[in-house]
């Protein structure tokens, strides 16, 4: 009998120019176009059941894999995503993001991902994640950080433009 170990634990770290609040704002933006920030979350699967000030219950996914997640960002510099339902993940599956302000003004993001397969497909995906899939997930994470940074810069540019136009009208 062949057994596939069903839990994968993956850990990434990255520095960003974003503040923790800016990253959390991107992470918890469940509007259309979420896939522009998170490649593994398409509008087709996105369903927001509850969105509060510091928590949300959301289903998201892509390519035939979905999960319902409980987002909790009530603790400063920390966001926990707990899988409450999925077609492949169960058990202790989820994500934990921890943010640390750096003296140079950047933020250190530490993300810990747990994937516990609840069926054969989930266990097989977990095996892939532990081996060749870790690099893919790292790139997806890095792309998300870069997309949120770009979105933040675009917002700042719009604010600068509005302030500039307002100053011109006042003169």
Language-model regions, residue ranges each:
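Hydrophobic ligand-binding cavity/cleft-lining segments
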Residues: 1-53, 171
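Short, surface-exposed coil-to-beta transition loops
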Residues: 7-11, 64-69, 90-96
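Short structured motifs
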Residues: 9-10, 54-55, 80-82, 93-98
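A short, structured loop/turn motif at beta-sheet edges
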Residues: 16-21, 51, 72-76, 98-108
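Hydrophobic pocket/interface hotspot
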Residues: 23-27, 71, 81, 109-111, ...
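Glycine-rich portal/gate segments that line the openings of hydrophobic small-molecule binding cavities
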Residues: 35, 42-88, 143, 147, ...
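Beta-strand/loop substructures that line and gate deep hydrophobic ligand-binding cavities in soluble
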Residues: 84-142
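Charge-rich (especially acidic), low-complexity segments
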Residues: 156-171
């Amino acid at each position: 009998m062949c057994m596939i170990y069903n839990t994968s634990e993956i850990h990434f770290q990255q520095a960003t120019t974003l503040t923790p609040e800016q990253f959390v704002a991107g992470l918890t933006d469940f509007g259309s176009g979420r896939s522009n920030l998170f490649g593994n979350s398409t509008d087709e699967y996105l369903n927001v059941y509850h969105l509060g000030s510091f928590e949300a219950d959301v289903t998201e996914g892509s390519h035939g894999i979905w999960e319902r997640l409980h987002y909790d960002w009530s603790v400063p510099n920390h966001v926990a995503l707990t899988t409450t339902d999925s077609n492949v993940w169960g058990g202790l599956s989820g994500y934990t993001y921890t943010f640390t302000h750096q003296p140079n003004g950047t933020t250190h993001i530490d993300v810990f991902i747990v994937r516990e397969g609840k069926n054969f497909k989930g266990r097989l995906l977990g095996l892939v994640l532990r081996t060749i899939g870790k690099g893919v997930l790292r790139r997806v994470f890095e792309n998300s950080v870069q997309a949120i940074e770009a979105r933040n810069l675009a917002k700042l540019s719009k604010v600068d433009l509005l302030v500039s136009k307002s100053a011109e009208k006042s003169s």
